[in-house]
Amino acid sequence: MKSEQEVLEQIGIKLKEIRISKGYSSYEDFALEHGIARMQYWRLEAGKSNPTIKTLYRVLEIHQVSLQEFFSEGF
C-alpha cells in the first residue's frame, strides 16, 4: 500500500499530465484562466497539498475527466 505522500505525488503527476495533454503548458495560465489560486494549483501538482474532493472534482471537471477515470489507473 502506498503512503499518503506517494498518493499525493501521484495525484499531482496525473493532474500535470492531464493539464499538458489539454494544451496548457503552464500551470499558471491554467490556474489564472479558471479562477484557481496559482500557488494552490502549484501545490496540487507538486504533491504538496491534500486536495479536498471538491477541489479535485472542480479541476477534473474543467478538464472533462471524471473521478472514476482519474483514479482508474496508477492507484
Regions found by a protein language model. Give the residues of each.
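Key DNA-contact positions within bacterial/archaeal DNA-binding proteins
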Residues: 39-42, 49, 68
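Residues within the helices of the helix-turn-helix
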Residues: 16, 28, 57
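Short alpha-helical DNA-recognition segment
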Residues: 23-43
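DNA major-groove recognition helix of helix-turn-helix/homeodomain DNA-binding modules
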Residues: 52-69
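Residue-level signal for the short linker/turn that defines the boundary of a DNA-recognition helix
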Residues: 13, 24-26, 51-54
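A short, Lys/Arg-rich alpha-helix, primarily the initiator
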Residues: 1-22
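The alpha-helix within a helix-turn-helix
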Residues: 19, 31, 60
